[in-house]
């Protein structure tokens, strides 16, 4: 189940961010100001927790990359969304939760936000994440440096709607 993250989740998210594996996968520049992020109610970013029977296990962030105020992604077309995802609980990594969260977020971007393109930027060294993103359909855009982090930008384009054959 997915639910919106709230200010009450701040301490949990800070603890997840301190995990050495999460830090290694996230890079030096990829940390959220949870006090600000969870207190603001803006329509260009969403924070969702994956919640299992025994509590939250991971978080996924959905960003309208064209409207996001820091312009992290540079100048992108309207309808471009970006994702950031991590599994906070070590016992949940490598068990399919990230795939399920990613598929949920892709569906939300395309159906709720009418996105035409989704971007994601794992570190070039995060081979497992890159393989996952490719497996669900993302394609390489190319390497890019964000701050001190060497990333591989990948994108997923919205599938074209089916076309009806002309009658006659």
Q: For each of these PLM feature ranges, what is it?
A:
Residues 134-143:
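Conserved acetyl-CoA-binding loop of GNAT-fold acetyltransferases
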Residues 28, 33-92, 108, 158-159:
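Acetyl-CoA-dependent GNAT
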Residues 77-80, 116-119, 123-127, 143-168:
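C-terminal "cap" of GNAT-fold acetyltransferases
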Residues 94-108, 131-135:
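Conserved acetyl-CoA-binding loop-helix of GNAT-fold acetyltransferases
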Residues 109-113:
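Hydrophobic pocket-lining residues that define ligand/cofactor binding sites across diverse proteins
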